[in-house]
Amino acid sequence: MDQEHPQEPIEYQISNELDLHTFLPNELGELIPDYIGLCLQKDILRIRIIHGKGIGTIRETVHSLLRRDLRVLRFELASHEEGGWGATVAWLSQTLNKSNDKM
């Protein structure tokens, strides 16, 4: 890394879609929960996570993270029109998020 020009964090606009092609697999454990929290802050309750088709390692990691997150009501592979098995759609619980904010 250049000491004169330290690398600045990249800011992303939060939308209902997260494309993981620009992220490393070891970043997903923090990225996905943070993304869900930011979506809930913006009242985005249906999200689409693009993980690519590949051999399924990223997809399995995404599904594992979604399965463990209590703010996720359910998830499934996207419809053919939304990317098929290269993307996952999840529905989030705003109610659960608001009760967690009060803790």
Residue ranges of model-derived segments:
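Long, charged, low-complexity intrinsically disordered regions
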Residues: 1-103
